[in-house]
Amino acid sequence: MPASASKRTLQTCCGTHIVHDGLSDVSYVLLPLLAQTFGLNLAQVGMIRTAHRVAMAAFQLPAGFIAERFGERNLLALGTLLSGLAFIALGFSSGFWMIIVTLFFAGMGSAVQHPLSSTIISHAYPGEGRRTALGTYNFAGDVGKFVFGGIVSLCVLAGISWQAPVVGFGVAGIVTAVVVFMCISNTQAHAPSAAKPKVQGWGIRNKPAFAALCMVDIVDSTTRTGFLTFIAFLLIAKGVPEGWAALAVPLVLIGGMAGKYFCGVLADKFGVIRTIVITEVATGAGILATLALPGMATFFLLPLVGVALQGTSSVIYGTIGDLVESDKLPRAFAVVYTVGAVCGIIAPLGYGLLGDVIGIEKTIAIAGVIVLLTLPLALVLRAAIARPAVA
């Protein structure tokens, strides 16, 4: 693929990621507004969020299989269109069940985005620069989370009803679907030719290495989700005012935005294994440091923790292409993203139950130690992944 086409593909996928992650995470801002508008109780609020997350987790793997026949670009455009239409319908919702249905379909549409965009980028950057490209794409999603949530907050402060920005987001989704279809080449062109027969099965070149990569993802995802869920509670336990503690997660995410990009660059320059070791050791040390430092010192450390905590994901996604045949990438990415989504559902519950038994500080300490299990797993990858050439 020519460099200009690769760049256009990356830009389009980054824009799509901004829209989809914005649509997915704006629900955090919308939930209290929906509860106030429709008189919802906390159980109903939880059901709304769960419906969206379950749809995203459940449909990622089917999307990977369907894309192998339908084409990654085509299914990505269709899913983006579905999410846009669902958000327009959400803007005209009349009650709880309509909200549930619209956000379920929005989650179904967004489920295709991560595995298919990652596959498309991997096709556009099959060799050098793939991890940097995926790190850039990974960074773009966090931009969407901040922008969409910020737009709703500003509209509410300005006296504009939440329905207006929600419908606007839906229109943005439809426009993005058209852009995807127009600007990304037909990814069915990457299907095997007669000269290169179709790979049977999952197309995994090195099953032990792929399994180890999935295990790294499991440990990394559970640590990340658990830490983000309970860091504010740790700060409150240290005596930090609740208003400051509420800013803990945004601070981690701000650092994480930088980490997602720069860790992809580091992996391209210094190799996958070294980068995983650096980021996971830094993550463990950072988490344990939040226990050792005074309250406000911990607060200001959080962006640095976020760089390492969030950055490993770019390395993981950028490594899948080394282990899987190109025509089987959609299902491979779907597996890894589904693993992360399931961990995001289970980890808060597991760490929450543990915290009730042994306390918040010991629970955070366990998370900081468990993340170091990624180090021996990273060594399993060494034999399968050649160190990328330094530019």
Label every model-predicted segment:
Residues G39, G71, F92-W97, G271, ...:
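Helix-breaking motifs and short loop linkers at transmembrane-helix boundaries and internal kinks
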Residues L34-A35, I66-A67, V152-I160, L235-I236, ...:
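Interfacial helix-cap and linker-helix signal at transmembrane-aqueous boundaries
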Residues D25, R53-L61, F146, L253-M257, ...:
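Residue-level signature of mid-helix packing/kink "hotspots" within the transmembrane helices
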Residues T102-A140:
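Cytoplasmic helix-loop-helix junction between adjacent transmembrane helices
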Residues A58-W97:
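Conserved MFS/SLC helix-loop-helix module at the cytosolic interface between two early adjacent transmembrane helices
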Residues Y137-I184:
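Helix-loop-helix hairpin linking two adjacent transmembrane segments in secondary transporters
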Residues N74-I88, R274-A289:
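Structural signature of the two symmetry-related core transmembrane helices
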Residues S27-Y28, P208-K260:
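Extracytoplasmic gate region of multi-pass secondary transporters
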